[in-house]
Amino acid sequence: MSKKNIIFIVNLGEKSRVGRNNPYSYSINSWKNWAEPKGYEVFVLTDRVYEEEYMNANWHKTYALTLLENNDIDYNQVLIVDADTIVHPDCPDFFEESDGKFCAIMNNGCYEWVNRSIKVYGDKLFNDVELKNWQYFNSGFIIVNKKHLEFFEKVHKFYDESGDIFRSIQQEFKVGNDQTPLNYLTKLYDVDVKLLPNCYNLQEMHRKNLLHFPNHSWFSDELHFLDSGWVYHFNGIPNHPERNVGYWMERTYKHLYGDLND
């Protein structure tokens, strides 16, 4: 029997952001709908490896391969995908485009934030590593395989040695959690990164005039992003009282798949 490809999703509640994961069931079910006809499996992490005070939910994605190995789950390739994404049912099989490499999608959102994050982490932890914003990927969609297990072991060792600095940077500067360090660490450890098309991680959609907000948007109230990609990442959305992340994830899921219990 051939090894299966796996979709790995972190779904952890956080005391610092209560209710953040409430709409994640829409993401998880969309991925199950996409994966099951292909014979792929979806694994959802709901138990912490470390307490929140030591490691937040974002960093737990780096344990995907370790957890699969420790539980004797064989696999071919693994997509580590954020739980604030929804996949279109007609999405092509991106695993076939990986060439066996570490794959991600270039971050295509707020360049000021990316530049600031690169600078802060560079100054504090990665002085000798050069990272440009046009090389910078979003960590919400990453394809890996067994040969990347050693890389993630190095990531964990680096976190164990520098976790206090990571946590203080996030607390003081608000420049992200795992994403910028992972970009730097792929450079530091010479990981061959292949950038896939942004259709597989359509990010910060409100900046692209793809989300309609009443009394603000000039364009029609439709799901315009459905024509702009295959995987919709609901990040960087303003906390609108009526059209927050949960609203957009629920609306998108029901449009594509119907109610959750269907």
Name each model feature, range by range.
Residues 119-133, 150:
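Short, flexible, basic/aromatic active-site loop/helix in glycosyltransferases
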Residues 1-76, 257-262:
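N-terminal anchoring/stem segment of glycosyltransferases
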Residues 150-262:
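A glycosyltransferase accessory/donor-loop signature
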Residues 1, 97-98, 134-136, 218, ...:
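Extracellular/periplasmic catalytic domains that process cell-envelope and extracellular macromolecules
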Residues 12-15, 49-51, 85-86, 109-111, ...:
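Short, solvent-exposed loop/turn segments at secondary-structure junctions
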Residues 3, 61, 81, 137-138, ...:
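Residues that flank catalytic or metal-binding motifs in active/ligand-binding sites
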Residues 57-118, 143-144, 148:
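GT-A fold catalytic core of metal-dependent nucleotide-sugar glycosyltransferases
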Residues 129-144:
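A recurrent flexible, glycine/aromatic-enriched loop bordering the glycosyltransferase active site
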